[in-house]
Each structure stands twice: as C-alpha cells, then as structure tokens.
C-alpha cells in the first residue's frame, strides 16, 4: 500500500499528538504543601502536579483558602486513567487566550471563583504581573513555576519581563553617552579654539 506524502505526514503528526495537552494558564481545585509533595513517591509526582498545585507552607497559609487541600486518599490514586481525567479538568479551567509578546505574555481567563491561575513558566524576579491592569503578586509554585491570584469573572493577565539589572544598565549606557558627547564637544571646541589662535 503506497501512501502519498501528505498521508505520511498526517500519520506522523497523529502519532505524536498529545491527547492530554493542557493549554497555558489554568486553575486548580486542589493544593498540596511542598512538604507533602516531597513525601510522595518520585515516580508519581508528575501525575500529582496535574491534580494539585504545590505551595510552600507559607504560601499555603495565605492562598490555601482559595483551593481545597488535597485529601490523602487522592494523593495515591495516580494512574494513567486518573491523569487523563485530571488533564481534562485542567483544560476546562484553561485560559481562552494565551499570547506571547516581546515583553512577556498575555492571557485571558474566566473563573467561577477567586483562584490562583497557574502558568508553567519558570519563576524569575524579572517578571511583573498585572491582573486587570493592577499589579499583582506572583506566587512561586510547583518547584519554581508561577501563579497569580485572580478574582471571579473575566480576567486579563499580563506578565511583563524585564531582566534583572536592565534599569541600571540603561542608566549607565545613557550616562556613558552623555560623557562621550561632553568629551567630544570639548575636543571640538578645543580644536576650533586652537585654529583661531
């Protein structure tokens, strides 16, 4: 049986399609503390991360009221079938819009209740988050990723990235240009003065 090039490409594409794909920016129903997460078997942690958001003990005290603490029984049933269900549940809470831009990314999400919205983007001090135009705290979750608290209803989320030290480097560059211009102007003035004399 001979296949056309297009049929082969479609077959290959379908072979590598992730049917459990979850878009960027979604909410959880459950949370787990970092301590509890570290006590679970390493082999099941990936599945657990699709079921519950991992918060530090300190962040759990602040943000735990927006989520339900994952019961111990739900920490054990981490089979492929339950993973598929967890992916389906995360997809149902996912952002309707996610766009990368030159300074970071933008997302839009509608929430039934106030909740943390998770982004699988590495946490970095250079990020500033804005929820509905207001600056918001970024929570470091899941061992180094980011989440931001959003109110119930429609939300517009922007993460703006500015590398650490960029303000200082811009100020130094601008200062250097000013010094260079003054230095150049001095020599031009001196040269003209010497020619007149």
Summary of predicted features, one role per range:
Residues 1-12:
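Single conserved hydrophobic/aromatic residue that forms the stacking wall/gate
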Residues 4, 16, 26, 123, ...:
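Aromatic side chains
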Residues 15-17, 149:
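Short, well-ordered beta-strand micro-motif
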Residues 17-86:
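Catalytic cores of secreted or luminal carbohydrate-active enzymes
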Residues 60-61, 66-197:
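Active-site-proximal, structured, solvent-exposed surfaces of multi-pass membrane proteins
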């Amino acid at each position: 049986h001979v296949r056309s090039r297009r049929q082969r490409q479609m077959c290959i594409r379908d072979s590598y399609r992730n049917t459990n794909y979850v878009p960027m920016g979604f909410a959880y129903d459950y949370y787990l503390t970092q301590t509890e997460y570290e006590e679970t078997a390493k082999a099941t942690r990936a599945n657990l991360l699709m079921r519950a958001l991992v918060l530090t003990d300190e962040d759990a005290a602040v943000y735990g009221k927006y989520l339900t603490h994952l019961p111990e029984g739900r920490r054990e049933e981490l089979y492929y079938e339950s993973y598929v269900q967890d992916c389906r549940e995360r997809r149902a809470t996912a952002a309707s819009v996610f766009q990368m831009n030159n300074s970071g990314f933008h997302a839009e999400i509608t929430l039934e209740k106030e909740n943390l919205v998770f982004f699988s983007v590495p946490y970095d001090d250079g990020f500033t988050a804005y929820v509905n135009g207001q600056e918001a705290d970024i929570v470091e979750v899941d061992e180094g990723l980011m989440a931001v608290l959003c109110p119930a209803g429609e939300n517009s989320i922007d993460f703006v990235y500015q590398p650490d030290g960029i303000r200082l480097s811009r100020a130094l560059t601008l200062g250097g240009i000013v010094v260079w211009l003054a230095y150049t102007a001095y020599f031009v003035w001196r040269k003209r003065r010497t020619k007149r004399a």
